[in-house]
Amino acid sequence: MSATMRETGWAKINLALHVRARRADGYHDIETLFAFVDGGDTIEAALAATDTLVIDGEFAEGLSSGADNLVLRVLALLRARYGADRVPPLAVRLTKRLPLAAGIGGGSADAAAMARLVRTHFLPELGDATLARIVGPLGADIAACVASTTCMGSGTGEDLHAVAGLRIAGVPVLLVNPRQPVATGPVFAAWDGIDRGPLYIGTDYRAQLIGARNDLQRPALAACPAISDILLELGALRPWLARMSGSGATCFALFDAAADRDAAKAVLAARHPGWWLMAGALR
């Protein structure tokens, strides 16, 4: 495919995730601080006679390239809303670099990347908030992934707002996954129902993040004990924060310096060649 358009599905992490209540509709009220890493899946697209999707990359196996894929659903939704004259058919290639069912956005990041690609090239009048409102209902975290910038999420995670004075762009981060998928639904279902209090993040974000938590970590450990091993190993490599993201199994560590992050990655790569590792910085 001769690609003329390109976007990145930035990896999402939950720097903290407080579960506050189980709702009558089966969903949960949460408070979370979303952040994004400067790496992820890539989407390339070119004008075509009809929509097509090809998926390649390390984590392509088992993914559907049919109309049920979120990438094509976003394309179809925007075309239905704005017309085929404004949103033409595209041949799309999705390169999967992020593990699946891993707590770092994955399909939501890809859907948001497709939405941004269409916006950039065909619907430039759409702002992030409008785009998120349109495509957000297609899946959890898509609304946050549209802008892919640090923000607080509440409700089911789709009520988004900025945190005044929070400047964490450029913080070195290391992502680690044991290559074991963890389904989100069962982890939320196994939450113990105890509200352990709200999430507050202000300008003293380091101390506040250290004092925060991921309430899904305990139920995720039951599904994937390797999470405990990862957190123990990360903690020994002296980050200022190590925590599980989302419903797992990916864990992250934040460091003071890129050299410390890179040294930690080298240690883990040597000790655990089967683990997936990605070094980057927060956007």
Curated annotation (Swiss-Prot):
One of its GO terms (biological process) is isopentenyl diphosphate biosynthetic process, methylerythritol 4-phosphate pathway. Its EC number is 2.7.1.148. The active site is at 12, 141. The keyword Iron does not apply. It catalyses: 4-CDP-2-C-methyl-D-erythritol + ATP = 4-CDP-2-C-methyl-D-erythritol 2-phosphate + ADP + H(+). GO terms for molecular function: 4-(cytidine 5'-diphospho)-2-C-methyl-D-erythritol kinase activity; ATP binding. Keywords: ATP-binding, Isoprene biosynthesis, Kinase, Nucleotide-binding, Transferase. ATP binds at residues 99-109. Transmembrane segments: none annotated. It comes from the Bacteria. Pathway: Isoprenoid biosynthesis; isopentenyl diphosphate biosynthesis via DXP pathway; isopentenyl diphosphate from 1-deoxy-D-xylulose 5-phosphate: step 3/6. Belongs to the GHMP kinase family. IspE subfamily. Catalyzes the phosphorylation of the position 2 hydroxy group of 4-diphosphocytidyl-2C-methyl-D-erythritol. This is 4-diphosphocytidyl-2-C-methyl-D-erythritol kinase. It comes from Sphingopyxis alaskensis (strain DSM 13593 / LMG 18877 / RB2256) (Sphingomonas alaskensis). The gene is ispE.
